[in-house]
Amino acid sequence: MSMSKLLSPPPTSPPGPALSRLPCRRVAPPPVLPFPFPLRRLTSRRVFATSCSSSDSEHAPSASSTALAGAGDDLSAGVTQEREGALPFVQLSSGIVLRTEEQSLLGDHAPAPAPASAASSFALLDELNGGCREDDHLGETPAYPAAMNALYAACLAGNATEQLWNFTWPAAVAVLHPASILPVAVLGFFTKLVVFAAGPLVGELISSLPRIPAYRSLAAIQTAAHLVSVATITYAFAVHRAAAASLLLRPWFAVLVASTAVDRLACVALGIIAERDFVVQLAGAGRPVALAKANATLSRVDLLCETVGASIFALLLSKNNPLTCIKLSCVISLCALPLLIFLCGEMNRLADGIFDHSENTTSHAEKTSSFSIRKTVEEAVATVRNGWSEYMRQPVLPASLAYVFVCFNVALAPGALMTTFLIHQGVRPSVIGAFGGSSGAVGILATFATARLVKELGILKAGAAGLIAQSALLGAAVVVYLTGAVSRRAGALFAFLGLIVASRAGHMAYSAIGLQVVQTGNPASKAKLIGATEIAVASLAELAMMAVAVVASDASHFGALAALSATAVTAAAGMYCRWLANPSDELRRIFPS
């Protein structure tokens, strides 16, 4: 088919004398033409609407007019001759509608546009392709890319010290009483209790404070809590060791509980600021692809820190006793604090100072002007009640509750209880470090695979796939443990640990996907309050499991904790899949795909 035939009037237009062509002249159309779209007055030089989510192959022009015409139904182009004072438009089925400006807008002395040639048509299509790719690039780029890199560096510095600390303190406490997991379980119980009770308050408090000073202060508080914990554990090693039950009644243990709770609370607050505020603001409004990439990068940073922390812990423990390891961990925290403070300020500078003020400075000033203890307590209770109310009303509540159920898994995951269990089993430090490091490495790989999983299945179904995979692998790990071969054969122990490591892929996939589901389903004004309440509910789940661990204080009861952990993850997968099987209208609106 020739280009002249392609540019001929539509077959629905009746032929007649009025349509006869004259050289270099415009022709007038018949009085009525069946336009597929109403003609509207244009105010811009070139207005086009395009679906930039389509692949480049859908928008790329053909190399010849024959290829362009051969597109058939996939390229239904209707070119109509213009009315007096209106230029033609080209309708493409790929979603591109190009309209040129009215001749009256060209000026009195502007020459009339010449009829479109094949070369000019291709040039227009090339320009549209370039605009689509430019829009894609803008949607994938954060609003403040340099500041986002500074945020990644700050999270790297903070998470590295935190992950190393999370390995060293359980090992040191476990050595205080090698025959029982009770001290570690009690510390975990009270830590989760404090986070559960104060989580919504923390979310409200950090919303009323300038973000940069609050972030720096929390980092300093966390480091101070590490110092107090190290001093307390050092004192505990110096005094005469007692039975596990009487050890809990010592004054130094109460101080250790308080410092550990403060450390965890500061960690939660830092995470809320970084994941629910900083990353959202730096990604920019209306840039979901940039936000998704930023969330994935933060997950990789956290997992990289987990891998590095476990490796450093294994190296330190192989050459030193647990007390020396925890002292070195505290020194690393002290060294990282100045770097963290600097990177936080640098991030704000690169973001043009968007974090200089709190989000609600007026209400905060009103609160501080009329301070009273009774009013403060009433406001705290109201904040907690409001946080729970907003959390229960969120449209993506099942996705958040599935994450809470996953948090019941405190036994079959790298953490305090698993580290204590492995030490009691007499496992070598290199194996403990390899377990933690490989768990982080698998998580990092999962963040890359998650993007493809979301592309193939969609974000909601990809979350279900992650939960199902995690529940299946943890169930297999429990079966291996309950056979009783873990304590007798090294092969069974490695199989048990290997299944847990593999389950981290599903865990991290749902962690990344669930975070974006909750971010997308809730307005920005309520993000930190709902996020803090979600963490409080998750701490309640961990609190319940730690209470079970306190009751089953003997290491021989670890199998019961493992079975409960696997059951909770299975329940999370079932609840999430049921939610997807019966979607509400609100869910279809938020996630139309």
Swiss-Prot record:
Primary subcellular site in the record, as a coarse category: membrane
Annotated coiled-coil segments of the chain: none
Molecular-function annotations in GO: iron ion transmembrane transporter activity
Alphabetic keyword roster: Chloroplast, Ion transport, Membrane, Plastid, Transit peptide, Transmembrane, Transmembrane helix, Transport
Subcellular location: Membrane; Plastid, Chloroplast envelope
Transit peptide, start-end: 1-51
Function of the protein: May be involved in iron transport and iron homeostasis.
Family membership: Belongs to the ferroportin (FP) (TC 2.A.100) family. SLC40A subfamily.
PANTHER family in UniProt: SOLUTE CARRIER FAMILY 40 MEMBER, SOLUTE CARRIER FAMILY 40 MEMBER 3, CHLOROPLASTIC
Full protein name: Solute carrier family 40 member 3, chloroplastic
Gene source species: Oryza sativa subsp. japonica (Rice)
